[in-house]
Amino acid sequence: MAIAAVAISAAFGAEDAPPDHVKWMKDLGSQMGALRKGVDVEKNANDMQATMKDVTEFWKKRNSEVGLKTSNDTTAGAAALAKAAQGGDKEAMMSASKMIGGGCKGCHDAHREKISDTVYKIK
């Protein structure tokens, strides 16, 4: 019975992502894809920082500690990656990439509910 109550609560707590949020996530997905391939690393890391400013504001307005912390972690990782790429420091680039991935994962684990292979809601 308790499990059903939690499931129902979670289902009603999820909401469609606003169009701006969907755009930011698609932009971040493209940026991450390019970073994984090593394409224009400094540029994509800088673009990611700009996108993350909007994401951070989104979570700040929602008073989400997890959303805010993970957004800040991702932004810091993107800044570190841009700096490392500029200097050609591959070890620092790997470390920064892990920071970005950890920030994304932390937020997705807390706030993303998978509805289908292509549809997610915010919880």
Residue ranges and their predicted role:
Residues 12-101, 113-123:
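Extracytoplasmic c-type cytochrome modules immediately beyond a signal peptide or single-pass transmembrane anchor
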Residues 3-15:
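Sec/Tat signal peptide C-region and signal peptidase I cleavage site
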Residues 105-113:
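Detector for the c-type heme attachment site
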